[in-house]
Amino acid sequence: MHSFFTDPATHIGPEGQLHVWAMAKAEVRSALAPFAQACDAFDCLGLQPPSALHATVLRLAPHDGDVAAFCAAFRRECDGLGELHLPVQWPAVVEDSVICLGATTPQWDRLICATKRASIQAFGDEATPYNPPFSPHLTIAYGVCEGDDEPIVAALQQVRVNMLRDTDDGRAHDVDDTAADAIGEDQFCTLDIDSVVLARVYQDRQVGTYTCDVLAEVSWV
């Protein structure tokens, strides 16, 4: 495990910058709680607060702007999109964090495009200089210093084994059968998205968290 926050070129603190987040719903936060508890045992990890558990849609350049204009433009751009049901993998250790990787679907790509267009309409042509995330994902914990991956992997695997043992059908949670094909047997749950938040985001490198002030929540369903 390496620190998520050591490369200023990619992980520079947002310092109140606007982001568009898809927040994890209560059932997903509850499902991930045992994994977060397992991660909390490791000093090299900083837990993301459950209330701020999210999938980043897009990071924006502005620190402020016409929130009402963004919401109106976003609803227009998302017309006909429908609710997203993204299959999400079991929590896994990557180089600098513990994440649940989601499937990139045509709906997710359209959501990103809608967010870009709405941001430009509301905040100007320079509003979206950043690339979207490599894939939709939820980060349970960020690396804050060097650490050994193996015990983290083992702890997460034990939680998974316990969950599967406690279910009748070998699945920890109900999932969308159609979307499941995108990830297959490694699917943990489904991330349902019918709204996003426009938020002013803050990074705490010492404890390894991203938190936010929500400026608006906007739904298109």
Question: Which role fits each region the language model picked out?
Answer:
Residues 49-61, 133-143:
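Extracellular/lumenal glycan-associated surfaces
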Residues 47-52, 66, 150-151:
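Extended intrinsically disordered, low-complexity coil regions enriched in Ser, Thr, Gly, Ala
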Residues 31-32, 70, 111, 152:
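Hydrophobic side chains in well-ordered alpha-helices
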Residues 9-44, 50, 57:
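The feature marks the first
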Residues 1-26, 68-96, 121, 126-221:
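Flexible phosphate-binding patches that engage nucleotides and nucleic acids
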Residues 111-119, 196:
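Small-residue-enriched alpha-helical segments and adjacent helix-cap loops
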Residues 61-64, 105-108, 144-147:
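Helix N-cap motif at beta-to-alpha junctions
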